[in-house]
């Protein structure tokens, strides 16, 4: 095993942990832990390691009590043989104001190693992003690491994306929960599921990670991660997290992954809001040439707020998800909500529809209500949420064709509160290139930006992921960039959205698997007090470069760059 790094002094950084030893057979040694900082300084990172079966990466060191960055967890060891990839190390804990460290990426192997968990945030800091799951050549891709929990007043960290595999993609990691007393900070977004399979052998996409929950009283739930693409079945979208009990909107469910041969993935369910807030939109079902996935269920309002839209069904006869019912006092039901048996509720809905009509006609958005979802297969944009409050509608998926059509952009969130709509997935290119995913919709004052849509698969080149939407100016999380499609030439991951005043930038989307693998998307820029987002992982086989970390705000740290993809000496398509 590698030795541990030394602890820093009163003003100084912790030392890096040593690399684990290489084993020609058996298991490689574990990496040493990074040293801890004391008052002013950064925790030590950990050197990557290799081995017969990969050893585990060491844990990142903790940040200084007052200032300094938490250490990044070490990468798990990799192998090009039949052994297992090592697990990534956990990120270090943040100091008083610092974000937790990013978890290490899992090592590549016959089964991919799990990504390391993001470190816990300091008292006012957000949790760290979970590590990317490792690539697998003959079994399951590694599971993405869970996002770190926010400090007492901090936001939850984003879950890591699942590893790609030639058989079955790994599941995305769950987003971390926000701190108990967080004043508007959101739960972390779930990680994107890994892509799975080959054109000749089929394969299954990994499920998206669940969004983290907000704090006890205030804040929005994190969005669920999108399911991965599968050459047979697409992965299921992750459910959105729940909001604080008083104020906040439920997180949006993740889109289901495209299933090229059999079935598209089911969209994730939208999260539950607080007393004041909108239910989360359900994710769109994944497209398929055989059976499209059903859309996710929209979250139900409580007192004041709209029900979430039911997710649109995927191309291939997928059914739309059931929409959420509005709050008891004020709000509009989400798309595809069940007919009410209450005369009072029916009257309330009819009156609101009459009030909304002139606003919709003159401005293109209602006074109160969600924007409409874009029609699947058209690439239509989602509608904007209400002038007072409402979620943006999900973008429609792109059309299947010689070259796939681009997915529609998600609609903007409402002015006072509301979540931006999720971008639509790019369409499949039957003989050419796949379509690009749509961008996530932006929030305005209080709300989270929508996640970008995944790029569409294509015979010659995959589509790029859509960019994540920007967070609300005051509260809410930035959207995650969509994943690039896996094919002969993998697509580039989308750029994460920019944070608001206190929010970190969104994570970049992972690059697609391929002989010429896609580059990970860049992390979004942090707000005034926020850190830059983590760059997306590069696609494997090619391999692809990791995405650049986002720029920190005036008082925030820069984001960690994404891990590069794993190359293989074997012949690859493309």
Please identify what each model-predicted range represents.
Residues 1-574:
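Long, compositionally biased tandem-repeat segments
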């Amino acid at each position: 095993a590698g030795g541990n790094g030394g602890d820093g002094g009163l003003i100084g950084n912790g030392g890096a942990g040593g690399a684990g030893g290489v084993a020609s057979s058996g298991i490689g040694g574990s990496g040493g832990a990074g040293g801890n900082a004391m008052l002013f300084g950064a925790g030590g990172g950990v050197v990557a390691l290799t081995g017969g079966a990969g050893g585990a990466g060491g844990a990142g060191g903790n940040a200084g009590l007052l200032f300094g960055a938490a250490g990044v967890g070490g990468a798990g060891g990799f192998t090009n043989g039949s052994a297992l990839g090592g697990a990534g190390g956990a990120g270090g804990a943040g100091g008083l104001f610092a974000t937790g460290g990013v978890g290490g990426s899992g090592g590549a192997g016959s089964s991919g190693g799990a990504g390391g968990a993001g470190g816990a945030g300091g008292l006012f800091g957000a949790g760290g992003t979970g590590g990317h799951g490792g690539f697998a050549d003959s079994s399951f891709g590694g599971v993405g690491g869970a996002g770190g929990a926010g400090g007492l007043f901090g936001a939850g960290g984003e879950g890591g994306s699942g590893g790609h595999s030639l058989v079955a993609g790994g599941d995305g990691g769950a987003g971390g929960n926000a701190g108990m007393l967080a004043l508007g900070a959101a739960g972390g977004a779930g990680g994107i599921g890994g892509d799975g399979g080959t054109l000749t052998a089929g394969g299954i996409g990994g499920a998206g990670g669940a969004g983290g929950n907000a704090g006890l009283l205030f804040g929005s739930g994190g969005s669920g991660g999108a399911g991965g693409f599968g050459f047979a079945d697409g992965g299921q979208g992750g459910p959105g997290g729940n909001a604080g009990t008083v104020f906040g909107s439920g997180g949006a469910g993740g889109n289901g992954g495209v299933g090229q041969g059999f079935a598209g993935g089911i969209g994730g369910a939208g999260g539950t809001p607080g007393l004041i807030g909108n239910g989360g939109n359900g994710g769109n079902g994944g497209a398929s040439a055989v059976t499209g996935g059903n859309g996710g269920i929209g979250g139900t309002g409580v007192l004041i707020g709209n029900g979430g839209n039911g997710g649109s069904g995927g191309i291939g006869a997928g059914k739309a998800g059931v929409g959420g019912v509005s709050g008891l006092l004020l709000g509009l039901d989400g798309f595809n909500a069940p007919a009410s048996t209450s005369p009072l509720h029916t009257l309330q809905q009819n009156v609101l529809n009459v009030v909304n009509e002139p606003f919709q006609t003159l401005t293109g958005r209602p006074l109160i209500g969600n924007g409409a979802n874009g029609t699947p297969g058209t690439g239509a944009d989602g509608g904007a949420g209400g002038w007072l409050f409402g979620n943006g509608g999900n973008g429609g998926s792109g059309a299947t064709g010689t070259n796939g059509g681009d997915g529609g952009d998600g609609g903007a969130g409402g002015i006072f509160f509301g979540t931006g709509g999720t971008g639509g997935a790019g369409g499949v290119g039957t003989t050419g290139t796949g379509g690009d995913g749509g961008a996530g919709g932006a929030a305005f004052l209080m709300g989270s930006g929508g996640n970008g849509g995944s790029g569409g698969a294509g015979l010659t080149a995959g589509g790029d992921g859509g960019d994540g939407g920007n967070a609300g100016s005051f509260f809410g999380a930035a959207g995650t960039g969509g994943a690039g499609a896996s094919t002969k030439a993998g697509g580039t991951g989308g750029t994460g959205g920019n944070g608001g005043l206190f929010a970190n930038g969104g994570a970049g989307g992972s690059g697609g698997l391929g002989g010429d693998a896609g580059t990970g998307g860049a992390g979004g820029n942090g707000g005034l007090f926020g850190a830059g987002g983590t760059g997306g992982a590069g696609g494997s086989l090619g391999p692809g470069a990791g995405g650049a970390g986002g720029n920190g705000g005036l008082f925030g740290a820069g984001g960690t760059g994404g891990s590069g993809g794993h190359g293989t000496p074997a012949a690859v398509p493309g």
